[in-house]
A protein has these predicted regions:
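Flexible, low-hydrophobicity surface segments
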Residues: 1-169, 193, 271, 281
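Glycine-rich loop/linker segments at domain edges
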Residues: 7, 13-16, 82, 87-102, ...
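C-terminal catalytic domains of large/alpha subunits in multi-subunit enzymes
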Residues: 59, 68-69, 87-91, 99-100, ...
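Short acidic, glycine/serine/threonine-rich loops at helix termini
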Residues: 76-80, 135-138, 237-239, 262-268, ...
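Active-site-proximal alpha-helical scaffold in enzymes
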Residues: 125-129, 270-277, 307-318
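Helix-loop-helix junctions that connect adjacent transmembrane helices in secondary transporters/permeases
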Residues: 160-244, 410-487, 686-707
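A glycine- and small-aliphatic-rich helix-loop capping segment at beta-alpha/alpha-beta transitions
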Residues: 231-233, 241-245, 267-278, 304, ...
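Thiamine diphosphate
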Residues: 261-283, 287-289, 501-509
C-alpha cells in the first residue's frame, strides 16, 4: 500500500490560492447582474410602524425595494435553522418545565418588529452597488422603540423585556443532567468546597472573506442558482429551497473556496434567500457582498456564556462531585443550541469526578444570534474547570499540577464514562502533561522568572488540560471515479475553508488505492454534483470523509478484482491487490487502475458510498502558556506557548500543526483582546470596526511549540479524532491561568477575559489599594 497517510505533504491547493486562482463567491459575476444593499435596524428592539420607499425607488438605477410585507405576500418561509442537536449522543434539551423548545422564527425580513441592532428590514436592488447603497440610505422606516435587554444573566433571572411575546420569560432552554442525588450526597460529606462564576464573553469570527452571494433565477427551468460561501453547500441548498417554497432540485448551490468560517458560515443567512428571491422578482442575477461594518452587526457571533461551578474534594484533594449552572445567550433567535448542548456534558473535563450535575439554560436577548463558534461550547467549560482547579489549589494550599495529576483519568481507565454520561473512547492524559512540560522547559521556569524580575517584569506560567467531543452531522457520502485518462475523482460533501481537504482527503484515497496523491482530485461545493454531505463543522470532516472514502475504496478494490479477473483471464480468487495494481497470484501478470478503466465498460470502476456515524470522538491535550507582565503599565508579552494535542491518527501532521497554530491564536484572541461590546444604555455596538474590535497579529504571539500525542480512536478505521479546534479549546484557560500566576504576588485571584493591559493594570492597582 502506498504510504501517504501520516506524511507532511505540502498542500495541493496552496499554489492555486497563492497565485490568485481561488474561486471565492465575490470572484463570480453574471451577465446583466444587479446589486443588492440591505437596510438595517438602528435599534436593538423596536416595532416597525411603517416604511416609505418612494425616495429610494425614484433614484437613478434603483430597480426595486422589497420589505417584510413583500416577503409575507410571497409566502417566503422562515429559515429552518433546526438548532437542536440531533445525533444519538446529544443531550435532550428541553424548554422550562419540560416544554417544547421555542426557537423564534427567522424571517428573511420582519414585518412587525426588529429584535437586534443591524437586523435586515428591507433590501434595495439597483444597477450598481453604489446606487443600491444610495437607495438604502433614503429608505425611511418608522419605528417605535421598545425596551431591550442584552445581558445574559439578567435574561435568565427574569423580569427583562421579552424578545418574543410567545416567551415572556426569555428562557428557551432549561434542562438538567447528571446524578443529582449522588452529587448532593457528595457535597454534604465533602471536606472542601470551591465555587466560582465566570463569564466567557461574546466574540465574532471575522473571516477574511466577507459574506457574499450571487443568485440568479431561470424562469424557463424554474430554478435558482446560488453562489454562496458556506460550511456545506448541501445543507444550504435544502434550507434555501424551504425558504423559497420550492423543491430542493429547483435550487443549485455553488460553494467553492471559502475564506474562513469558524462556524459563522455554517447556517443560512437571510441575504442568501433575499438575493435569490429578488432575482426572481427583478428578472436578473443579484449580487451582494457584505462590508466589514455590516459583518460586525449581522454575522452570527459566538460564545457568551455565564457559568457558575462548584467542586467538592476530600481531605487529600480527590475530586468528589461537581455542580454547574450554564447560561447561554442565543441572541434574538435560536440559530444553534450547539454551544450549550456540546459544552455542558464536558463540564468535568479530563478529570475523574464520580458525580456531577449540570443545569443547561439558553436565553433570548436583543443581540445578534450566536452560533457554533470554533470548538462550540468546549472552550467555555474548559475555562471553567481549569480556572476552578487553580482556585481550589490556592484555597487548599496545593500544587495545581499535583492536584490535576491526582484527578486525571488514567489511560488504564479508558474507555471512561464521565459523570454526565459521555463515553471517552481513548486518551493518555498524563502523557500529554509530561510531554508538554518537557517541551515547555517546565523545570527552567524559575530561572526565567528571576530573569524577568531583574528586568522589572512579572513572569507567569499557565496550564490547561482539555478534552473535546467531536461528532457533527452523522451522514457523509463519497463518489469515487477511476478515470481512464489517468486520475481519480473523489466527490465529497464536506466544505473546506482553509483546512487543506484537497490534500488530506487525497492522501487517504491515494494510500488506499495505491496511487500517487497527485492523481487524486477532490470535487466539492456544487450541489448538482455533490448530492449528499454534512459540511464542515464540529471537527467532523477528516473523520467522516476519511471513513467513507476508505469504505468506498475497499468496495472499489473488490470491484477492481472482478474487472481484473476478466482482463487477465483469471479467477477472482487468484487476484490480489497491492500498490495500485491487480496481480494474478504467483505470476508476473498484472494490470493497474487506469488500464483497467480503459478496458472496462465506462463508469464500471466507480462507486457511491454513504455512511452514518453517531459515535463521538474525544480529542484532548495539554497547553502551557508563559507571559511577562509590566506591572507599571499592565502590558503583556506572550513569551512561550506549548501545545500537545491528541488528534488520534494525524493524516497530515503539517496541516494539523497549521490548524493548531490558527486555533491557538483564535483562542488567545478571545483571552487577550477580542470582545463584542455593546453600550448598555443605547444598545449600540462599540466594537463595530477593526479599529475597535481587537484582533491578534502574527507579531503578537511567539513561535509555538506544538507536539502530537497520537492515540488512535477505536471508533473509525483510520483512528481519527479531530485536529482543528483543540488550540481554541485550551488556550483561553492556559493564558488566563498564566496572567493570574504572574499576579499572585499582589493577591489577584482572577481576571476576566479579555485580559487587556488596562484590565491587568486595574487589577494590580485594586490589589495594592486593598
Amino acid at each position: 500500500m502506498t504510504k501517504a497517510i501520516g506524511q507532511p505533504i505540502r498542500r495541493k491547493e496552496d499554489h492555486r490560492l497563492l497565485t490568485g486562482q481561488g474561486q471565492f463567491t465575490d470572484d463570480f459575476s453574471a451577465p446583466d447582474q444587479v446589486y443588492m444593499a440591505v437596510v438595517r435596524s438602528p435599534h436593538p428592539h423596536a416595532a416597525i410602524e411603517g416604511m416609505d420607499v418612494a425616495a429610494a425607488t425614484s433614484l437613478p438605477g434603483v430597480l426595486g425595494v422589497f420589505t417584510g410585507t413583500d416577503c409575507a405576500v410571497d409566502n417566503l418561509a422562515p429559515v429552518p435553522h433546526s438548532p437542536l442537536p440531533k445525533t444519538d449522543h446529544d443531550l435532550n434539551l428541553r424548554g422550562p418545565g419540560d416544554s417544547d423548545v421555542f426557537i423564534g422564527p427567522h424571517m428573511l425580513l420582519p414585518a412587525d418588529k426588529v429584535r437586534h441592532l443591524g437586523e435586515a428590514v428591507a433590501v434595495v436592488i439597483a444597477e450598481t452597488r453604489g446606487q443600491a447603497l444610495d437607495g438604502a440610505e433614503v429608505v425611511s422606516v418608522s419605528y417605535t422603540e421598545l425596551p431591550f435587554n442584552q445581558d445574559t444573566s439578567a435574561a435568565a433571572e427574569g423580569g427583562t423585556p421579552p424578545v418574543w411575546d410567545e416567551l415572556p420569560g426569555n428562557t428557551c432552554i432549561d434542562s438538567s443532567f447528571g446524578d443529582a442525588a449522588g452529587t448532593e450526597a457528595a457535597f454534604a460529606a465533602a471536606a472542601h468546597k470551591v465555587k466560582a462564576s465566570f463569564h466567557i464573553g461574546r466574540v465574532t469570527g471575522v473571516p477574511m472573506e466577507p459574506r457574499s452571494v450571487l443568485a440568479s433565477y431561470d424562469p424557463e427551468e424554474d430554478r435558482y442558482t446560488i453562489h454562496a460561501g458556506s460550511g456545506g453547500a448541501v445543507r444550504q441548498k435544502r434550507e434555501l429551497a424551504e425558504v423559497l417554497g420550492v423543491e430542493p432540485d429547483q435550487v443549485r448551490v455553488l460553494s467553492y473556496d471559502v475564506g474562513g468560517n469558524f462556524g459563522t458560515r455554517n447556517r443560512v443567512y437571510v441575504e442568501f434567500g433575499l438575493a435569490a428571491w429578488a432575482s426572481r422578482k427583478i428578472g436578473r442575477p443579484v449580487k451582494y457582498t457584505s462590508d466589514r461594518s455590516e459583518a460586525f452587526l449581522s454575522d452570527y457571533q459566538g460564545r457568551d456564556l455565564h457559568t457558575t461551578v462548584e467542586l467538592v474534594l476530600d481531605a487529600e484533594g480527590s475530586f468528589l462531585a461537581l455542580r454547574a449552572d450554564n447560561i447561554s445567550n442565543v441572541g434574538a433567535r435560536a440559530v444553534s443550541f450547539s454551544p450549550i448542548g456540546k459544552g455542558s456534558p464536558l463540564i468535568s473535563g479530563n478529570y475523574r469526578i464520580p458525580a456531577a450535575t449540570v443545569r443547561s439554560r439558553a436565553v433570548f436577548t436583543n443581540t445578534v444570534p450566536t452560533q457554533a463558534y470554533r470548538s462550540s461550547g468546549r472552550p467555555e467549560v474548559t475555562f471553567a474547570i481549569e480556572r476552578l482547579i487553580e482556585i481550589a489549589a490556592r484555597e487548599l494550599n496545593m500544587d495545581p499540577l499535583e492536584l490535576r495529576r491526582r484527578n486525571l483519568v488514567d489511560k488504564e481507565e479508558m474507555p471512561y464514562t464521565n459523570p454526565i454520561g459521555l463515553y471517552y473512547d481513548s486518551g493518555h492524559y498524563h502523557d500529554n502533561m509530561a510531554i508538554a512540560m518537557t517541551a515547555a522547559d517546565w523545570d527552567g521556569r524559575d530561572v526565567r522568572r528571576k530573569d524577568a524580575a531583574a528586568r522589572g517584569k512579572l513572569l507567569g506560567v499557565g496550564f490547561a488540560n482539555y478534552v473535546e467531543s467531536s461528532i457533527g452531522t452523522p451522514v457523509e457520502q463519497t463518489e469515487i471515479y477511476i478515470r481512464p485518462e489517468g486520475h481519480v475523482e473523489v466527490v465529497i460533501g464536506t466544505q473546506p475553508s482553509g483546512q487543506g481537504h484537497e490534500t488530506s482527503f487525497a492522501q487517504v484515497a491515494a494510500e488506499w488505492l495505491g496511487l500517487p496523491v497527485s492523481d487524486v482530485r477532490i470535487v466539492i461545493g456544487d450541489t448538482d454534483v455533490v448530492k449528499v454531505g454534512g459540511g464542515s463543522h464540529s471537527g467532523r470532516s477528516m473523520r467522516m470523509a476519511g471513513t467513507v472514502i476508505v469504505m468506498a475504496a475497499d468496495e472499489l478494490i473488490e470491484e477492481g478484482k472482478e474487472v481484473a479477473a476478466e482482463v487477465l483471464e483469471a479467477s477472482v480468487s487468484d487476484i490480489e491487490f497491492q500498490d495500485g495494481a491487480f496481480q494474478v497470484t504467483g505470476t508476473d501478470r498484472s494490470v493497474g487502475w487506469y488500464e483497467l478503466a480503459q478496458k472496462s465498460d465506462p463508469g464500471r470502476l466507480s462507486i457511491i458510498k454513504s455512511n452514518e456515524m453517531h459515535t463521538p470522538v474525544f480529542p484532548n491535550g495539554t497547553h502551557i502558556c508563559e507571559v511577562e507582565i509590566d506591572p507599571e503599565t499592565g502590558g503583556i508579552e506572550l513569551t512561550r506557548y506549548t501545545a500537545v494535542d491528541d488528534v488520534g491518527r494525524a493524516i497530515n501532521p503539517m496541516i494539523v500543526h497549521g490548524q493548531t497554530h490558527g486555533a491557538i491564536v483564535q483562542g488567545l484572541g478571545q483571552a487577550m483582546v477580542e470582545a463584542c461590546v455593546l453600550d448598555p444604555e443605547t444598545g449600540q455596538t462599540l466594537s463595530g470596526t477593526l479599529m475597535d474590535y481587537g484582533m491578534l497579529r502574527a507579531g503578537d504571539v511567539p513561535a509555538f511549540q506544538v507536539e502530537l500525542n497520537e492515540v488512535p480512536s477505536p471508533t473509525n478505521p483510520l483512528g481519527i479524532k479531530a485536529g482543528g479546534e483543540g488550540g481554541t479549546t485550551g488556550s483561553p484557560a492556559a493564558f488566563t491561568n498564566a496572567i493570574v500566576n504572574a499576579l499572585k504576588g499582589y493577591g489577584v485571584t482572577h481576571i476576566e477575559m479579555p485580559a487587556t493591559p488596562q484590565r491587568v493594570w486595574r487589577a494590580i492597582q485594586n490589589a495594592k489599594n486593598g
